[in-house]
């Protein structure tokens, strides 16, 4: 198996890992009920999206 020719320095390793972070999801306030919801998704509290009530079918 191949092995690295040179040891990776702490700085190079840390610079590479700066992009391995978690992103905060985009939360907005629902205009209908005021609850916090994910952007571009139906509100879990009241079931509205884009000013319209979305009826979700349940099995």
UniProtKB/Swiss-Prot annotation:
GO cellular component, one term: large ribosomal subunit
InterPro entries associated with the record: Ribosomal_bL32, Ribosomal_bL32_bact, Ribosomal_zn-bd
MF GO annotations: structural constituent of ribosome
Gene Ontology terms describing biological process: translation
Coiled coil residues, start to end: none
Keywords: Ribonucleoprotein, Ribosomal protein
Family statement: Belongs to the bacterial ribosomal protein bL32 family.
Known partners and oligomeric status: Part of the 50S ribosomal subunit.
Protein name: Large ribosomal subunit protein bL32
Species name: Bacillus subtilis (strain 168)
